[in-house]
């Protein structure tokens, strides 16, 4: 069975078997996840980002510290801290040069780090046939666009130039990320610096437009579903600095179909009840089939980095591993 058919089958299974019924596992877990979120969390984070934009980052530092908890890792995964900003996850007891996933964490470009994406990176590496390089890029608003993007491009270049040291196959480097990290992965793939360096992309509910898009999902899920519109707009302002929001390096969704067809083969996994859902859907449609899109209809934002939506997380890990290890 070809990869496209495999992904279609998985998408159908996610919709029909675990995503279609109102009492599905994904829906029950997502609803429980939302109910467990502290009251006022989104408003607190929005205010913290807005204060940081104005020059007072004390509240944002508190948010960053709260998202920087060490994670318990799998016994069959070893971790190498290559530098302050690069952490390599390697499956134990596997010989030969493996494919590599270079992963960019989410957090609205303003918080998150190596620890916030550790659970996902560890889970992918634990599958046994992929190494994962997590990247701690500079954060906004202290370091607005293009600082974080430059750091991510540098990480891909480092992996490409040090394949022997890392024990990877330089021809099978992929990049990925969730939310704002997915935005960075897209921009890296289309950058002149990394053109041709990536074999594939794996994206989870990526930001593809750094502005309020007014779509159906933006209106319907803009409050109470894990990422509120006010917080997303604060993230956008922080990252943009003085950059035009229609710059294609921050709003890849504005690229033409011809430009998007320059992407490596891409898997986009969407949450059905997410403010960013329609951005990703439009991007996939515009790509002319370059982007394979899978939707978990009952999931909400954050299933990659914040525990609570275990079924969506597990399926995302499985899809990632299958996509990256699929030989072309």
Regions found by a protein language model. Name each.
Residues 2-91, 245, 328:
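A glycine/proline-hinged amphipathic helix-loop "lid/cap" segment
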Residues 268-270:
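Short beta-strand/loop motif that positions the catalytic acidic residue
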Residues 143-163:
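Alpha/beta-hydrolase active-site loop
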